[in-house]
């Protein structure tokens, strides 16, 4: 039986945690799904798991809408993560299974576990890939099917770190996926190219702290290994157009 993922450093007052996964399949999958708490990792001691819902979308119902609204928005992401052949197969898929849920200020992460439990079951039944919408990442179906049902939370499975070059020649770095945990995304700017690895580790560690339940508010300070103290501010997308974030975000300066 899967133990619910609890947040060891949970601090109340956060936002709602939302997750959205889209599983694509070339074939119609069983309804109802043969979901097993033991086999798929569905937690049984979390009310948050009950917030997750599954909706089926079939290409045959409205082919143009299916392509425009379900598949095409993620084609570039799938191609980048999994290659052009997988992206081409995704564009031709016949069925999409949308897993969604939202929990107010989640004290445990049962909603995240439940979503992946459904995705694992779908992939065992024939889904070929899963898009993690808020983390902007695509996973092969065979990899999702292989997820251990009793695994511990792995932050870097749930959160993606991105880097891009700015017009000034420096780097911008940001997270995607913290929305699942009711926390703002984190942005770091004006990074020297030779500090990319160091910055990735810092961003990973900050993300892990937020996933564990800590909060960062505008005006809060965050200590970094080199002794500096960065201060959190609301992120203005116009200040760094290369940063692609929808929703709440903080920049640390």
Q: What positions do the PLM features span?
A:
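Aromatic/basic-lined ligand-recognition segments
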Residues: 134-253
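Active-site-proximal structural scaffolding
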Residues: 14, 112-115, 199
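Structural alpha-beta junctions
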Residues: 39-49, 117-131, 208-217
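Charge-rich interaction surfaces and accessory domains that mediate macromolecular binding and assembly
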Residues: 2-28, 36-37, 234, 243-245, ...
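Short acidic, S/G/P-rich loop/turn micro-motifs used as interaction or catalytic elements
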Residues: 28, 103-107, 192-196
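Internal, hydrophobic cores of structured domains that mediate oligomerization or house catalytic pockets
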Residues: 63-164
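Short cationic amphipathic helices and targeting signals
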Residues: 16-26, 96-99, 186-190
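N-terminal low-complexity, intrinsically disordered segments
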Residues: 18, 24-88
